Regions:
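Glycine-rich phosphate/diphosphate-binding loop of Rossmann-like nucleotide-binding domains
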Residues: 6-23, 27-31, 148-220, 229-232
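Buried hydrophobic positions in well-ordered alpha/beta secondary-structure cores of metabolic enzymes
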Residues: 11-14, 68, 129, 171, ...
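Glycine-rich phosphate/nucleotide-binding loop
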Residues: 47-49, 225-326
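N-terminal glycine-rich phosphate/adenylate-binding segment common to multiple enzyme folds
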Residues: 48-154, 241
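Glycine-rich phosphate/pyrophosphate-binding loop and the adjoining helix
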Residues: 66, 139-185, 189-191, 209, ...
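Short acidic loop-to-helix transition motifs that present clustered carboxylates
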Residues: 111, 217-224
Length: 351
């Protein structure tokens, strides 16, 4: 059976960057013939505002059952100030489909893209594995006496042994499979007693991987060290909130959010791929958005469905574009969104 890809272009610049990713997928089909069936879904702000529906529960179940992968552009629109549709679509997929692995690679394709003096492509090639279904994002808590001087808000952080163990084990397994020799865990165990669970499980699981060095950092120290000595890190594993923050920091070190792809996975099930950047409504329709994060997310999708050669071809085409200074203004280029997508697609076709 042919692999099935569901596409949610979303809001703002989402449709523009997804358009270019699908253009590159057409080039992949012409050369590598993976035979991927693409289904475009309407969900986003426009759909929500016209129907009152974010994404039907039955649709979520269908995606989990029938799709091999989901590609999302970006979700978020100022016309929906409560962000209900983004919460239901993005967090809904992560939680309801149990996509507990958030994989965010940060790889420098050209020395000129990093703001760090003296650092090169040899110093910046790391992956952040973020626990994607627990932590502070589970919305346990609430508010009391809202709008009064006595207002109270509470947010509980949820950490289960199962959740902590499976993301840590995934990080070590990935490191071994990809020839990485060090896994670093970030927490705040010196100030948050619950993070002792992360430390215990990290040591227990790490002991099963004697070929891999393990170390731990407090998250504030890691933020400093990631900027000062990024070459110290190969694989980072951490919780939901810290992973969200540290992966954004890592992305700016390799060229910005326009170069930052991501995958949301549960091995053996459907996976969701998306550029890390947001919907950037002020940029929508101006042909200025960098499509490379979406295209690199496509490459991660291809790798995830077993099309390793096609994934490598896409990644090489993006690298060639950066080397040739073909890009949007955020990476030092002069081209628009469409032209960048055209160039990368033609590079893939050329082989």
């Amino acid at each position: 059976m042919s692999p099935k890809l569901a596409v949610i272009a979303g809001d703002g610049i989402g449709p523009e960057v997804v358009r270019e990713a699908l253009k590159v997928l057409d080039a992949v089909e012409a050369v590598h013939h993976p035979g991927i069936t693409v289904e475009t879904l309407p969900y986003g702000a426009d759909h929500y505002l016209s129907t009152g529906i974010t994404i039907p529960p039955a649709e979520m179940q269908r995606l989990g059952r029938d799709a091999d992968a989901i590609l999302v552009g970006a979700i978020g629109d100022p016309r929906v100030p409560g962000n209900e549709h983004a919460r239901d679509i993005l967090l809904g997929m992560r939680f309801q489909l149990d996509l507990y692995v958030n994989e965010r690679p940060a790889r420098l394709f050209d020395d000129r893209l990093t703001p760090l003096k003296g650092k090169t492509v040899r110093d910046l090639d790391l992956v952040v594995f973020r626990e994607n279904t627990e932590g502070l994002y589970v919305s346990v808590g609430g508010a009391f006496k809202v709008g009064t001087p006595d207002e109270i808000t509470i947010a509980e952080e949820l950490n289960t042994r199962k959740g902590v163990e499976r993301i840590i084990r995934h990080a070590f397994s990935w490191a071994r499979a990809h020839g990485r020799t060090r896994v670093t865990m970030a927490d705040k165990a010196n100030a948050i007693p619950a993070h002792a669970l992360w430390r215990r499980v990290f040591d227990e699981v790490g002991a099963e991987y004697s070929d891999i060095t393990r170390d731990t950092r407090y998250i504030d120290a890691m933020a400093m060290d990631l900027v000062r000595t990024p070459e110290s890190f190969q694989v980072i594993v951490t919780g939901n909130l810290f992973g969200d923050i540290i992966s954004d920091l890592a992305s700016i070190l390799v060229g910005g959010l326009g170069m930052a792809p991501s995958a949301n996975r549960h091995p053996g099930r459907v996976a969701m791929y998306e550029p890390v950047h947001g919907s950037a409504p002020p940029l929508a329709g101006k042909d200025v958005a960098n499509p490379m994060a979406a295209i690199l997310s496509l490459a991660m999708m291809l790798d995830g469905i077993g099309e390793e050669a096609a994934a490598l071809a896409v990644e090489r085409a993006v690298r060639a574009a950066i080397t040739a200074k073909v890009g949007t203004s955020d990476v030092g280029g002069t081209l628009g969104t469409r032209a960048v997508g055209d160039w990368i697609a033609e590079r893939v076709r050329a082989g």
